[in-house]
């Protein structure tokens, strides 16, 4: 049973991907000559970034969660971020599961994605990419508000 103080720490949940998916993502980063690529060991998809902790149970199993994505550049407070937006009913379902438990979300909607670079500068990217995205596992940890410090 969760105690009151457990709810104040926040919750972060993410999906990690199979080695074959990581190989595909790294190949994509190289082919596109992505500036400042996210390193292999940090490639993930955020499922839940909640300012309150909830009793989320991570999923187990390895299976395809998407087979394509759309390249988009998002303007963020940290710069121009290149993402591969995934059409994944599974990741949306897991996000909605967290929300049903009471998790918060800072944006109007949830767009499952894999960040390819947190800083692409003026470079432009767009298009649909065929890539099998295979879940390896989910993990959860206390929310780190200053997570961008880990990127340095």
UniProtKB/Swiss-Prot annotation:
**Biological process GO annotation list?**
symbiont-mediated suppression of host innate immune response
Catalytic residues, per the record, are 44, 46, 113, 115
Binding, 3',3'-cGAMP: 12, 141, 147
According to its UniProt record, which reaction does this protein catalyse? 3',3'-cUAMP + H2O = U[3'-5']pAp[3'] + H(+); 3',3',3'-c-tri-AMP + H2O = A[3'-5']pA[3'-5']pAp[3'] + H(+); 3',3',3'-cAAG + H2O = G[3'-5']pA[3'-5']pAp[3'] + H(+); 3',3',3'-cAAG + H2O = A[3'-5']pG[3'-5']pAp[3'] + H(+)
Binding of 3',3'-cUAMP: at which residues?
A: 12, 141, 147
Taxonomy, superkingdom: Viruses
Regions crossing the membrane: none
Q: Which GO terms describe its molecular function?
A: hydrolase activity
Q: Read off the InterPro entries from this record.
A: Acb1-like_C
Keyword terms, alphabetized: Host-virus interaction, Hydrolase, Inhibition of host innate immune response by virus, Viral immunoevasion
- Function according to Swiss-Prot or TrEMBL: Counteracts the host CBASS antiviral defense system. Phosphodiesterase that enables metal-independent hydrolysis of the host cyclic di- and trinucleotide CBASS signals such as 3'3'-cGAMP, 3'3'cUA, and 3'3'3'-cAAA. Does not cleave cGG or cA4. Besides evasion of the CBASS system, might also enable evasion of the type III CRISPR systems that use cA3 signals.
Q: Which family does it belong to?
A: Belongs to the anti-CBASS protein Acb1 family.
Please state what the protein is called: Anti-CBASS protein Acb1
Which organism encodes this protein?
A: Salmonella phage S16
